[in-house]
């Protein structure tokens, strides 16, 4: 067997039965910022009603950086926590026209008075994130407070691009967001969510959640006013836009949403009337959601390469800020039906890989941290027996289930820490994807193996720590020196190599 060694801490090859991993720590790409998830919507119920032991278990799975006695991580160590700032639909009850109470959200503002005891269940997990050392928090709105909207509700009119907002209330809106951001000391604030969808009532006359569309002109105007308010009040929170509903709306200028597309150029080009790049309190970031663009592989890769190229030209970072399995994804995987196993985990890992490797995402977030739904939308699930759904049976207490998707995301989030740089890395093993990262103290590699099992010989002069998520493993730790690294079939593996 031909031996490969470190060459000035630049290049290493690990032989794998004729295959090899090669990487170069001097060829770097983006600097990683964070991995996150959101508290919608179940945390409102869980944090308020569930037994303390179960709330602590959820917090440990999501936030912990500790290991058990065998060296296996207790949690996935998220570095970003997304907190939904409610619009007041919960207080409206059925009059909100939002069908399910789980999807309604309280508001901190009643009249001119703030009640910081509202959204108490969500606050439990926001506090837990901070106590566990999560470095970044982000508050996001799906709708403006109902007292500031055109229709007095937290849902849209049903017309595309029609912002459900009374523009005479813009000062009250900036005051509200500034006060909430300052009170909770959010690192970031996202004022709009998936502006391309209509968020109106369905045929039943009711909607499924809070939300409003908005066109690029109005989004830029409102964001500029908010940015100025943050600057005037010395608010430390940074503004993040635009949470596009699909990634094509970031780059495409001839889409089916003509007043809501081409958002990278529109918001960050010096020649655009909607340019926000010069606002000191607006983060040089464009946020988008990976829904409906992940299958087939050719579309997943090509679109992300376009996003990465456009973001680089605009000199901004790209954040993938929300994803779960929706739709039928070209027949590859359907959103309906819970899957706690590796099929969904591997699909999600391929999406994470594409966003980071092809689009140069610096941040990647999942949608629902905890779900009660019979749907592929959670990292953790809460059910009472076979009773699935956002209902009274699961409202006050239920059994908890960790998914392989949780742990596969942890193969990234637990080890690819804020400030690490992505480096050049490749593997010749068929059906295996790889990304590499370094902080000069250690080098981290995440392998997404959708094919057969294989072995790699580790170099004798380095201890390699492996963490594997597979059918019978969840971030399971093994230390290897001068031995063979077993990469299981259908697995996600993280390799950590300490630099000398």
Task: State where each predicted segment sits.
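Glycine-rich tight-turn/loop motif centered on a GG-T
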Residues: 163, 205-215
């Amino acid at each position: 067997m031909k031996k490969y060694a470190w060459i000035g801490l630049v290049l290493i090859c690990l032989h794998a039965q004729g295959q090899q991993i090669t990487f170069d720590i001097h060829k770097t790409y983006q600097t990683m910022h964070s991995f996150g998830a959101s508290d919608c919507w179940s945390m409102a119920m869980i944090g308020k009603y569930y037994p303390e032991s179960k709330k602590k278990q959820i917090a440990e799975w999501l936030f912990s950086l500790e290991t058990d006695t065998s060296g296996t991580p207790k949690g996935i160590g998220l570095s970003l926590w997304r907190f939904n700032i409610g619009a007041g639909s919960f207080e409206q009850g059925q009059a909100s026209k939002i069908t399910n109470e789980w999807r309604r959200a309280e508001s901190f503002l009643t009249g001119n008075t703030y009640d910081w005891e509202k959204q108490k269940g969500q606050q439990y997990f926001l506090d837990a994130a901070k106590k566990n050392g999560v470095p970044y928090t982000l508050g996001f709105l799906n709708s403006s407070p109902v007292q500031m909207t055109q229709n007095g509700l937290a849902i849209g009119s049903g017309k595309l691009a029609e912002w459900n907002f009374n523009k005479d209330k813009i000062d009250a809106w900036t005051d509200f967001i500034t006060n909430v951001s300052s009170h909770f000391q959010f690192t970031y604030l996202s004022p709009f969510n998936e502006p391309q969808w209509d968020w109106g009532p369905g045929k039943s006359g009711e909607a499924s959640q809070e939300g409003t569309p908005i066109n690029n002109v109005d989004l830029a105007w409102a964001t500029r006013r908010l940015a100025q308010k943050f600057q005037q009040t010395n608010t430390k929170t940074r503004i993040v836009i635009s949470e596009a509903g699909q990634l094509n709306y970031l780059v495409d200028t001839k889409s089916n949403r003509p007043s809501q597309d081409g958002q990278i150029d529109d918001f960050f080009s010096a020649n655009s009337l909607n340019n926000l790049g010069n606002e000191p309190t607006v983060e040089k970031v464009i946020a988008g959601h990976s829904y409906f663009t992940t299958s087939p592989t050719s579309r997943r890769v090509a679109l992300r390469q376009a996003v990465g190229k456009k973001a680089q030209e605009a000199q901004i970072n790209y954040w993938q800020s929300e994803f779960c399995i929706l739709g039928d994804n070209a027949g590859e995987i359907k959103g309906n039906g819970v899957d706690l196993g590796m099929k969904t985990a591997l699909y999600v890992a391929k999406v994470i890989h594409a966003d980071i490797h092809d689009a140069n995402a610096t941040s990647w977030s999942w949608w629902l941290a905890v779900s009660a739904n019979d749907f592929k939308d959670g990292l953790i699930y809460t059910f009472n027996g076979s009773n699935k759904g956002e209902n009274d049976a699961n409202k006050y207490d239920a059994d908890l289930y960790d998914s392989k998707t949780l742990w596969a995301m942890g193969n990234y989030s637990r080890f690819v820490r804020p400030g690490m740089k992505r480096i050049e890395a490749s593997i010749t093993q068929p059906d295996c994807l790889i990304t590499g990262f370094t902080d000069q103290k250690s080098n981290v590699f995440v392998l997404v193996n959708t094919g057969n099992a294989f072995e790699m010989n580790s170099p004798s002069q380095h201890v390699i720590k492996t963490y594997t998520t597979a059918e019978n493993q969840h971030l399971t730790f093994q230390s290897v020196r001068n031995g063979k690294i077993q990469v299981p079939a259908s697995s996600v593996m993280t390799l950590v190599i300490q630099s000398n």
